[in-house]
Amino acid sequence: MNQLDALKQFTTVVADTGDFKQIEAYQPTDATTNPSLILKAVQKPDYRALLTDTVAQFRGRPLDELMDRLLVRFGCEILSIIPGRVSTEVDARLSFDTVASVARAERLIELYQGQGIHVDRVLIKVAATWEGIAAAEQLERRGIHTNLTLLFSFCQAVACAQAKVQLISPFVGRIYDWYKKSAGAAWVEQDNAGAHDPGVQSVRQIFNYYKKFGIATEIMGASFRNVGQITALAGCDLLTISPELLAQLSACKAPLARSLDANAAQSLDLTAVNYDEAGFRFALNEDAMATEKLAEGIRAFCVDAAKLDQLLLAA
């Protein structure tokens, strides 16, 4: 048995790509997209027609609507391949606007429903800012399920649990990147690998807390830099993995054991916490890594959204 098949025994495997022609080979349950992945995909000849067809069909419509229609086109293609859910992201430029995020999410769902897609097959991705979490709480009450992304800290995870969101996406690789860069020449890779990886440790802390207190929100580890980070999180609810790393797992025959165990977490001595807005903002500010990576992640998604805008305008 290869490691990908072994991982599927413990964890729901999700494909992290907009390149849906790569997905089928790995038979994931779900798939995730984001503005950067869609931008990367539409620049490939195989997918250019999705962009030009969308613009041709809806020429004259507002640019933000064209963007949403393009995202839904990709999502529908992906859903024709996978049995589960696709995650589609609200424009990151709305990350600090609760009202606008809710409105865009509702439009995305309406567009999916117009294509015959049931609401339960879509997760709306929203950045895990205070405003994004508030938007997700409203959406969940309306029966629209959410995936809180750009999650780097324990306080974000707790606030998401309080909001009863469907799923969170803690970013393993970007946490690793920050600590590696911060350490500079003092970084020793083997001392920070596997279970000692700071990104892995962050997800483990969240996993243990959620399972200890019976929190229903799903945890989907994301943003992996190497296979070791993935195998160290075997047993996490879901892991979203790039095609490149899916291929490496598929090619590896080494044994793979469960690393995270919900039953074991229930016996841990942990204290329940909660955050109001002031407490959340203070805790996030105290975490330099999370503060910097959240801001950086939003900026990067905004840059790619603007590039997608330009491609739509030029089509």
Curated annotation (Swiss-Prot):
MF GO annotations: transaldolase activity
SUPFAM superfamilies, A to Z: Aldolase
GO biological process: carbohydrate metabolic process; pentose-phosphate shunt
Record-listed E.C. numbers: 2.2.1.2
GO cellular component: cytoplasm
Protein keywords: Cytoplasm, Pentose shunt, Schiff base, Transferase
Gene3D superfamilies referenced in this protein's UniProt entry, alphabetically: Aldolase class I (3.20.20.70)
Reaction(s) the record says it catalyses: D-sedoheptulose 7-phosphate + D-glyceraldehyde 3-phosphate = D-erythrose 4-phosphate + beta-D-fructose 6-phosphate
Domain of life: Bacteria
Location relative to the cell: Cytoplasm
InterPro entries with a match to the protein in the record: Aldolase_TIM (IPR013785), TAL/FSA (IPR001585), Transaldolase_1 (IPR004730), Transaldolase_AS (IPR018225)
Pathway: Carbohydrate degradation; pentose phosphate pathway; D-glyceraldehyde 3-phosphate and beta-D-fructose 6-phosphate from D-ribose 5-phosphate and D-xylulose 5-phosphate (non-oxidative stage): step 2/3
Annotated catalytic residues: K125 (schiff-base intermediate with substrate)
Annotated function: Transaldolase is important for the balance of metabolites in the pentose-phosphate pathway.
Name of the protein: Transaldolase
Gene name as annotated: tal
